[in-house]
Amino acid sequence: MEPLDLTCDLTSLNGKSAFITGGASGLGLATARKWAEAGVYITIADIQPPTSPVQPGLAHCFHYVYCDVTSWESQVAAFKSALRFSPSGALDIVACFAGTALAPGNQIDHVLAAGVPSLEVDPPRPSSSVRNIEVNLVGSYFTSWLGLYYLRIPGTGTDPELPSNKCLLFCASIAAYMDSPKASTYPASKFGVRGLFRSTRSQTKQLGVRCNLLAPWFFDSPLIAPIKHAMAARGVDMAKVLTFTSIDACVDAATYCVASPEIHGRALAVQPEGTFDLKDDLEDGWGGNQLRPIMQRRRDAGFDV
């Protein structure tokens, strides 16, 4: 299984407008910078402003708007702000990158922690663990719904005779393709994003929108900082145990998805050894044929689910 050649023509991105949730840090911010260098006008929709300054000379390409992805009203307002910022009055790319860190603990762990079952005392409602589902899945559903709604607005000077090359990009995780017995809500949310992608991709072309999904392996970002620090406190180097992929590789995969007009309906696994098409289709066992060698390499490297 050979990795994909992610070479693509970045000139096709010049002058386009993108809406990126979770664009203030991590993968979202790194992607925003890469696309801005290619001439894309970026709206960063996040609950916080960018964590570091944008590139000198490219400030005019960036627009920040507060956005809580779990709130429909907040997302609607953010999309409207992005459309007002876009020089063409339209959006070309929507990237659902907002996410929360893995909430530790299997559902069984959480149930046992609630104590002995009783009819006298109600069990506590899960809070922090459910946040994974609220942000990662519900947030992605809202973003993709509104993205497909607002991507239909034509830009000024758009030739209706030319084919549209707009793009909706989901971000799941390799956790959407494997068992995760040490956590429940994070993989559940990512499996949900994968399901949303698979149920959506066959229909988006009728709106002139391509639809793709990223399924990255672990990479060093603010989201995994709590886990990284907890493992370090136990004397475990997370980077060595997991063999991080690079955030640059994830950015390259995202760029390949939006800049390549022939790429549609593909789920890309970003691994330390390269980026692979998971072939998440019926003909290829819904990704299983590709996933087996991918996970075997991770086990050979010392990863234990």
From Swiss-Prot:
- Where does the source fall among the domains of life? Eukaryota
Classification via InterPro entries: NAD(P)-bd_dom_sf, Sc_DH/Rdtase_CS, SDR_fam
What is the main EC category here? oxidoreductase
Documented EC number(s): 1.1.1.352
Q: What induces it?
A: The genes forming the sterigmatocystin biosynthesis cluster are co-regulated and induced on oatmeal porridge or the fungal isolates were grown either on oatmeal porridge or in YEC medium (0.2% yeast extract, 5.0% corn steep liquor).
Q: Which reaction does it catalyse?
A: (1'S,5'S)-5'-hydroxyaverantin + NAD(+) = (S)-5'-oxoaverantin + NADH + H(+); (1'S,5'R)-5'-hydroxyaverantin + NAD(+) = (S)-5'-oxoaverantin + NADH + 2 H(+)
Which GO terms fall under molecular function for this chain's record? 2,4-dienoyl-CoA reductase (NADPH) activity
Could you state one GO cellular component term attached to this entry?
A: mitochondrion
- One Gene Ontology biological process: fatty acid beta-oxidation
Give the residues annotated as active site. Y186 (proton acceptor), K190 (lowers pka of active site tyr)
Q: What are the binding positions for NADP(+) in this chain?
A: S25, L27, Q48, D68, Y186, K190, S221
What metabolic or biological pathway is this protein involved in?
Mycotoxin biosynthesis; sterigmatocystin biosynthesis
Function per UniProt: 5'-hydroxyaverantin dehydrogenase; part of the gene cluster that mediates the biosynthesis of sterigmatocystin (ST), a polyketide-derived furanocoumarin which is part of the most toxic and carcinogenic compounds among the known mycotoxins. The first step in the biosynthesis of sterigmatocystin is the production of hexanoate by the fatty acid synthase (FAS) units stcJ and stcK. The polyketide backbone is assembled by the non-reducing polyketide synthase stcA by condensation of the starter hexanoyl-CoA and 7 malonyl-CoA extender units followed by cyclization and release of norsolorinic acid.
Query: To which protein family does this belong?
Result: Belongs to the short-chain dehydrogenases/reductases (SDR) family.
Identification of the protein by name: 5'-hydroxyaverantin dehydrogenase stcG
| High-level lineage | Eukaryota, Fungi, Dikarya, Ascomycota, Pezizomycotina
Coding gene? Answer: swtcG
